[in-house]
Amino acid sequence: MGTEGTGTSVPHKKDWRENMGIANRKILHTDILIIGGGTAGCYAALTVREHSDYSIIIAEKANIKRSGCLAAGVNAINAYIVKGRKPEDYVDYCRKDADGIVREDLLLSMSQGLNRVTDKLEKLGLVILKDENGEYVARGNRNIKINGENMKPLLAKAVEELDNCQILNRVNITDYIVENNQILGAFGFSIEDNTAYEIRAKKVLCATGGAAGLYRPNNPGFSRHKMWYPPFNTGAGYAMGINAGAEMTTFEMRFIALRCKDTIAPTGTIAQGVGAKQVNSLGEVYENKYGLTTSQRVYGTVRENIEGRGPCYLRTEGITPEQDDSLKRAYLNMAPSQTLKWLESGKNPSEQNVEIEGTEPYIVGGHTASGYWVDNDRESTIRGLFAAGDVAGGCPQKYVTGAMVEGEIAAIAMVKQLDEGYLDPELDEETAFDRKIEEYDHFLDTDEKMFTYEAIEEAMQKVMDNYAGGISTHYQFNEKQLELAKEKIEQLQKLVWHISAHDMHELMFVYEVKERLTVALSVIAHLKDRKETRWHSFAENLDYPEKSKEWEIFVNSKMVDGELKMIHRDLVNLCQVPAGNMACLSLIHI
């Protein structure tokens, strides 16, 4: 018989949670550690194995089969050199979209590899749509159509078949191990059991994605994760680099996506697929009035609403029945809530325009230029630490294929450096590891803790929304607001140490909040440092509403003795920086 109705309890589970601490420790050694098993990380592993037999460990806090931005798949390759175009054309497009604040050397090396990695994806099994002549079906000047729902599983399967490659799924990396500005590995913990990891590595690739959840999102409560960027990308790689003293760039170039209202579904499929224009409530096409760059499209929508001509829409009324069907099928594959919204309304896209809105701001180096300051090999200012994908700065508009190219470039560079020889520095493993385990145990000790990670996260998002240019302020800010934002975020950082985690999964949430707070402070510092408005909405500074030639520079930062030190660097033109040579990037002032 069972215990039903007897009033007995199962105390062992409660006791396990309340007394939980790190019980096991594992020290692993590898030649190359890849942190993040998303698009860039997986492709880097494939490239390392293609060029060497060096041992690889991939640490992924989810599971590489469906992790990262590519988890649900995509319906187009958005960065591709179509017939009649050349890599330099893509560089030119990216430079114009970012109003000049880009690393042209990084853009060129990325652009030159876009078609190469696409070809490899097709060989792995990706279905790329072709016309009657066997040519790829283009969507605009830089895109080709695919059936890409299974793109990530294809990459993951190829990685899982590699020899001498250990995949640590459900392991959350929290800190780099750095001595004398050289990377030695990383610390982390398992999300599924109370095990802490020290992973010693000769080379490390950070491929952890960008940062979502810094600002209050479009949808509240239970639906807060219905957002443009993966809510599980919390800026871990940025935060680890910031705390370790790596130089970062262009965090003031936030990214705000223009999306279908409420569903936060992509708008490009409608704009490019059926040629839909942006119109206001009066039916006026307004997109040309403000400009067609990514930030200007958002800004125009914001201004039309502020000036009383909202809501704003993508004009789909009057499209053909065939286009109706095409749109519903396309969204069913990648954003089914939009198709369901049409079905629930009882109206096809041809019968009603699609309302649009901007998302909350994100920090994502795959769309803007924010991230690690790297050389052409994608090596950061910490020796042996590389960055690829959304964490790598200076190179916007990467999308899937660009992230793969950066993973490839970094992988080849790591192999080359290892081929040239590696001297293993001394490190007091036990002492450093002990300190990190004590930190984990601090949060796992639930006695007398005052706050939850959710409360701190909500407070952070409110601060950023109100004082650092969120949705509620139409993405606008002034210096006084940024000063208040900094003060309040620093207060929240102190409160983090009063959060309790009841299990290892909650411990991951605690570190996600810590990461976001670290990134938020960098965003605030960068927004305050750039005394102009170069990108409307992305960085709308009300104290400096105009663009200034004086600010045609990179705004960088580095943590020195616990304080962010701002650094200004010259723009980098095509082929200006040789691989592996950071010294030639001139310093303007510190």
For the regions a protein language model found, what residue spans apply to each?
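Core beta-strand elements of the Rossmann-like FAD/NAD(P) dinucleotide-binding domain
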Residues: 27-30, 193-203, 381
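Glycine-rich FAD pyrophosphate-binding loop
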Residues: 50-72
